[in-house]
Amino acid sequence: MDKRHDPSRRIIAPHGSQLSCKSWLTEAPMRMLMNNLHPDVAERPEDLVVYGGIGRAARDWDCYDKIIEVLKRLEDDETLLVQSGKPVGVFRTHADAPRVLIANSNLVPHWANWEHFNELDKQGLAMYGQMTAGSWIYIGTQGIVQGTYETFVSVAKQHFGGISKGKWILTGGLGGMGGAQTLAGTMAGFSVLACEVDETRIDFRLRTRYVDKKATSLDEALAMIEAANQAGKPVSVGLLANAADVFAELVKRGITPDVVTDQTSAHDPLNGYLPQGWTMAQAADMRKTDEAAVVKAAKASMAVQVQAMLDLQAAGAATLDYGNNIRQMAFETGVKNAFDFPGFVPAYIRPLFCEGIGPFRWVALSGDPEDIYKTDAKVKELIPDNPHLHNWLDMARERIAFQGLPARICWVGLKDRARLAQAFNEMVKNGELSAPIVIGRDHLDSGSVASPNRETESMLDGSDAVSDWPLLNALLNTASGATWVSLHHGGGVGMGFSQHSGVVIVCDGTETAAKRVGRVLWNDPATGVMRHADAGYEIAKNCAKEQGLDLPMLKD
């Protein structure tokens, strides 16, 4: 019997202002854990899988039940420790300490690979937490939409003079992360053709308005893209097909998209990527009987896809890796120039990271969408001179369907996070919001991750693989009084390729929350400015000086 599989489970987080726990500081992690497994949020909630291959919220259902039980009894001077999705201890701390500390998927470096992890996973000794799956702050696909939108806007600026009309993006994957590409692309003015092997994922994206149309053949999909481009109105198409097949076929036909990327779950060749010519049922059976054959076939298909991406780049397409480690997998399979196209962070996002700008997100614990709309208005009020941000908030309200508890994401930095959070806390205090707000972020942020093939690729000083920074980030957020803090390994790019930390804090309207929020949401993005200033980025150095950061080794 698989203790991780229970199709009878249907998890819905409580709404409203009535507590199930002893305070909002423990109610919040309980609701957010449950929200990660909401049927409209998680990819396979019956298996505790939230997104990203096998990214889980808890190790098994017994562990999930025990976490909920402990959170309901946890006092406001106690801290729950969670080890790879398993609640292992409750300790007396103090009121300003985190209520939950989480460590997921961490392995001693020599053993930090999928083979060793999968053995531990099969024995029930580990859990893959991805980034926000095991840290209980996943908000559905919206969580990556703005970052993807910002990337595509930057692509348009760098390659097409800021004009995306009549241009189209080829990509793969419509899972929890990849599903953002279609909506983000059309928001940025591009048409998007996204390949996906799982028809249920395409149908889900249609239902939640992330995809406009479904196609079952490449010719049909290309006709949809061509018609939309002729009409000057972007369209997103989910094509039921294997990305490796489609990418290679476009090369064969001499058809060159304007932009090429990919967000299949290539980081996990065993569980996340379907080999060419295989059915999903065949892959599921083979994973039980011959894991090595699955991995070998998946990586061979990735090599085909990456070679096609290189060929399309040579034909003129703006080609980028979107952080799923597909280049590494292809490189290991013989594509020696796999890294000839850049990752999206060094190519398009790093200047934002230098100012601590990243994926700031918040969730209405009330379950009331009006609480989010009121906070949207507050963001506009406090940041009046940023039309790009205002446009994002308007588009998000109009086009993004909430999944589970209502949430919002917007990319803001060191200058704004703490003051926005304190304003939200004041709104809770004054009764403008019907219940507290939780504020968190993706682990993909400026100071919270070491990932040489993604966030820290091609650092100015060569410090791509130095992982002291996310450890310091987690320690500082703990010391600053965050409500829960997490430290993970392998998110986004797979085992052995990343370490990263997460933070969540509750705005419950109290004065103590205002103080904690001020510390945490200043210090957290400040570590990103610190990390990039230390690496020699002038934008970060200037930001540090302007904001008065005390960085002892920063020269005037």
From Swiss-Prot:
User: Which Enzyme Commission number(s) are on file for it?
Assistant: 4.2.1.49
The residues annotated as the active site are 410
Cofactors: NAD(+)
One GO term under biological process is:
L-histidine catabolic process to glutamate and formate
SUPFAM superfamilies, alphabetically?
Urocanase
Q: According to its UniProt record, in which pathway does this protein act?
A: Amino-acid degradation; L-histidine degradation into L-glutamate; N-formimidoyl-L-glutamate from L-histidine: step 2/3
What is the catalytic activity of this protein? Answer: 4-imidazolone-5-propanoate = trans-urocanate + H2O
Instruction: Give the record's GO CC terms.
Output: cytoplasm
Any one GO molecular function term: urocanate hydratase activity
Q: Identify the main location.
A: cytoplasm
Q: Give the co-factor note.
A: Binds 1 NAD(+) per subunit.
Keywords linked to the UniProt accession: Cytoplasm, Histidine metabolism, Lyase, NAD
This protein's source sits in the domain of life called Bacteria
Where found, per UniProt?
A: Cytoplasm
Keyword NAD attached: yes
Binding-site residues for NAD(+), renumbered to this chain: 52-53, 130, 176-178, 196, 201, 242-243, 263-267, 273-274, 322, 492
Matching Gene3D superfamilies, A to Z? Urocanase like domains, Urocanase superfamily
Q: Which family does it belong to?
A: Belongs to the urocanase family.
Function field: Catalyzes the conversion of urocanate to 4-imidazolone-5-propionate.
The name this protein carries in UniProt is Urocanate hydratase
From what organism does this protein derive? Shewanella oneidensis (strain ATCC 700550 / JCM 31522 / CIP 106686 / LMG 19005 / NCIMB 14063 / MR-1)
| Gene responsible for this protein | hutU
